């Protein structure tokens, strides 16, 4: 069964990081283009410059993103995500964080620090179906 998927991508780029490398890595690894991102310049707590990158992808592009994501993660990492569906899902949104430095190297890895935040949304009308629906999504490419 194909599910309607919408994906939000949020990245904080610090002054010491090269935004163009990060954007190029998204295109190379996950096929998300520079023009898909909204770019906002702001300041951190100590007035340090930071850039917020945000993208929202839908329909066929979101399906392609999921396929690339699941193909790039190890089978163990995908199984770990499946095991953690209940803990990672809030209001039909599955939350996962990817290592920003690994993406720049052309790899994907699940991490909790200095990360790229992904929110994968699909309509779940009955909360008890959440695990089943997200398991189906993750097993498409597994």
Can you name each region flagged by the protein language model?
Residues 1-36:
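Long, hydrophobic N-terminal alpha-helical segment
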Residues 68-101:
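Mid-chain, well-packed structural core segment of small domains
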Residues 11-15, 30, 57-61, 100-104, ...:
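Beta-strand elements of well-folded, non-transmembrane domains
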Residues 7-12, 53, 90-94, 116-120:
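Short glycine-/aliphatic-rich beta-strand segments at the starts of folded cytosolic domains
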Residues 36-61:
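Short, charge-patterned binding micro-sites
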Residues 95-142:
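Glycine-rich, aromatic-bearing surface loops/beta-hairpins
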Residues 17-21, 61-68, 105, 127-131:
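Short, conserved charged micro-motifs
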Residues 29-34, 73-77, 114-117, 138-142:
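A common structural junction motif
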